[in-house]
């Protein structure tokens, strides 16, 4: 299967489960990242990231701008796929000026760690795991669909974590500084909220 067909297949799959609304036909460019051997995803810097737990590793990105795809910095660190952008020397204004819409789609066989920060949006479907660690901060949002035995959730600085469609037995959650966490639990909950 070539990269373009794999991207179309993943986009169609994400569309069928409601993670994305349309197949990205208006995007001018797409890119496949040859990365594997990760069990977590960390999204930063306002990127939109869709994750499907599936049979194989597949990391693709689409954008209105081929330049934006070249500015993506996607790598594996400590078994976590880190999805971000390269910093430019021009500071915030240069980053803002060059921040065209970029959508990253990931397929991976198993998942145990999710992180989002700096306004990133992380939508995850097909989760079926024993334990899941979730960390959201700085205005980011994480939504997870599937089932899991237990989860540890930390949300801060205006972040949102939506687990209403994740069947959980037990969870430990900590929300601070205007963050919110929505959980669907069947057994036990341990939580802390501040600020």
Task: List where the protein language model places each region.
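Bacterial N-terminal signal peptides that target proteins for export
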Residues: 2-13
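Acidic (Asp/Glu) and glycine-rich low-complexity loops/linkers
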Residues: 11-16, 24-117, 121-135, 145-152, ...
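Intrinsically disordered, low-complexity segments enriched in Ser/Pro/Gly/Ala and basic residues
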Residues: 15, 24, 117, 136-139, ...
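Short, surface-exposed interaction patches in beta-rich subdomains
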Residues: 144-195
């Amino acid at each position: 299967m070539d990269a373009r067909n794999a991207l179309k297949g993943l986009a169609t799959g994400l569309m069928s489960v409601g993670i994305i609304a349309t197949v990205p036909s208006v995007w001018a460019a797409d890119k496949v990242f040859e990365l594997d051997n990760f069990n977590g995803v960390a999204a930063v810097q306002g990127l939109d990231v869709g994750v499907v737990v599936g049979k194989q590793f597949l990391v693709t990105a689409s954008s209105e701008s081929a330049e934006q795809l070249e500015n993506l910095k996607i790598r594996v660190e400590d078994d976590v796929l880190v999805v971000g952008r390269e910093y430019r020397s021009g500071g915030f204004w240069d980053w803002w000026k060059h921040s065209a819409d970029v959508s990253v789609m990931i397929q991976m066989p198993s998942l145990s760690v999710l992180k989002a920060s700096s306004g990133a949006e992380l939508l995850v479907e097909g989760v079926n795991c024993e334990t899941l660690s979730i960390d959201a901060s700085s205005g980011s949002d994480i939504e997870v669909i599937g089932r899991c035995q237990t989860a540890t959730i930390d949300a801060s600085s205006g972040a949102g974590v939506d687990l209403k469609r994740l069947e959980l037995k037990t969870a430990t959650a900590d929300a601070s500084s205007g963050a919110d966490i929505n959980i669907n639990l069947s057994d036990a909950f341990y939580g802390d909220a501040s600020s």
